[in-house]
Amino acid sequence: MPLLHVNGISVPCKAILFDKDGTLLDLMEMWGTWAESVLRDMETHMALIGAGFTGDKNLLLGTVQDAKGRITGYDPGGPLPMATVEQTYGILAWQLYAAGVPWNDAIVRVMGIAKDAMNELRERRAAKPLPGLLPFLAQCAQASLRLGVVTSDESHTTAEHLEWLGISSYFGAVVTRDRVVKGKPAPEMAEAACRELGTLPEETVVIGDSNADMQMGRGAGLRLAIGISSAAGTAEHLADADTVVRDFTELTVSV
């Protein structure tokens, strides 16, 4: 059985599951840019109806902005890295509803704003792999490890992002939020990925950047839960991780 080496320990495993945003790809490069566009357009839209955000707009998605409105960081325990598409729509639509827009219209308007922001990303194919990811995936393939993706994103956007990164062929299972009844931190996504890869939970490792990933792994009985803390620079938000790394340069695989 291949060995995964991390922080001085060697773990036998047959499969590794990866979160997508903030794990496979740089979250700020993708969703920081998206959030910047969405919040800007939301602010403009609300000004047109004589309204404003009910509070600090950074608290909507858990972003950190500079004086010019550019997003420079995010709360690792906030909506930007963890919320599903539907949850994000709900957070944003509530602002319009509070300003007097009927809920159904608020949802439609938010979906339009979010779609425009995503189309901007598509034009740039805005996906950047985390440091060391591509060599690490090559090591995994060489060791015949089975790889899967478990993400709170939806199927069509996940497929796009993996294709932009050029890594689609590495993964034998891609479990997205729209494929399960209960998303993270429930164990269902990890359990489904293990079934599709043909491995047992105790032979499988999960790597992710949120504590929801760690809780999912623990709930599914996975062998090890590895947290990635590169975006926040701290591991405090990864309370349920077995061990924490900055990026994939701190992981190696051997046979």
Residue ranges and their predicted role:
Residues 85, 129, 151, 206, ...:
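Charged, low-complexity surface patches
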Residues 5, 11-131, 142-143:
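N-terminal helical cap/lid subdomain that shapes the substrate entry/recognition surface
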Residues 23, 151-153:
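Conserved phosphate-coupling serine/threonine residues in phosphotransfer and NTP-handling enzymes
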Residues 1-16, 44-45, 134-141, 155-255:
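Asp-based, Mg2+/Mn2+-dependent phosphohydrolase catalytic module
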Residues 123-128, 152, 182, 223:
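Short, flexible loop segments at the rims of nucleotide/cofactor-binding pockets, characterized by
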